[in-house]
């Protein structure tokens, strides 16, 4: 394979990675609704705007980080679309499963997963489903396989329709919104800590 062919192939894979990540951002935004539903509703217009900006900024950032840290290097190291799509689908499935577990845990307990909370979750699950550990594990594995199948479909769809997706000109405006929301939510949080926090 010539140098230009390899460069074009890698550019196409990276472009595919952007669209695959965008689709996962939408999925993460939907999962993020569980967090919003688990907390008290905002009482003012400004707090509602902050909630929306924070929701978009944070849940768009999660898949983006997975892309930059895990998928992007594979685009350079393994420039084979079938292998890359499989790896990306597996990585995305694992990340989304972790997000779903955290969202459901947050909904039930009011705090995020950590070393203590995993032990608490296992203890509560064992108490709730006494003697049914096998069923729980089987359900989790089945759920993961369904999600992995969905991610593989998503990876293949975005690959096969890449040229159509690129012509939609949705990427730049969506990226602008995600980046602005991310920086706005963090800036507001820093400002609030500096101005309103009273130890």
Predicted regions, residues:
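Transmembrane and membrane-interface helices of multi-pass
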Residues: 2-199
């Amino acid at each position: 394979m010539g140098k230009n062919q390899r460069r074009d192939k890698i550019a196409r894979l990276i472009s595919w990675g952007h669209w695959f990540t965008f689709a996962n951002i939408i999925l993460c935004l939907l999962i993020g609704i569980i967090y919003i539903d688990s907390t008290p509703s905002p009482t003012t217009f400004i707090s509602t705007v902050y909630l929306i900006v924070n929701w978009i900024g944070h849940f768009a950032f999660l898949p983006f980080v997975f892309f930059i840290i895990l998928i992007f290097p594979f685009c350079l190291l393994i420039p084979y679309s079938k292998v890359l799509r499989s790896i990306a689908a597996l990585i995305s499935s694992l990340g989304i499963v972790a997000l779903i577990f955290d969202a459901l845990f947050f909904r039930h307990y009011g705090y995020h997963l950590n070393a203590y909370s995993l032990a608490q979750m296992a203890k509560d699950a064992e108490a709730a489903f006494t003697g049914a550990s096998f069923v729980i594990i089987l359900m989790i594995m089945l759920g993961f396989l369904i999600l992995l199948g969905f991610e593989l479909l998503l990876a293949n769809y975005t690959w096969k329709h890449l040229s159509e997706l690129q012509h939609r000109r949705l990427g730049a405006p969506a990226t602008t919104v995600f980046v602005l929301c991310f920086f706005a939510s963090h800036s507001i949080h820093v400002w609030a800590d500096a101005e309103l926090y009273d130890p």
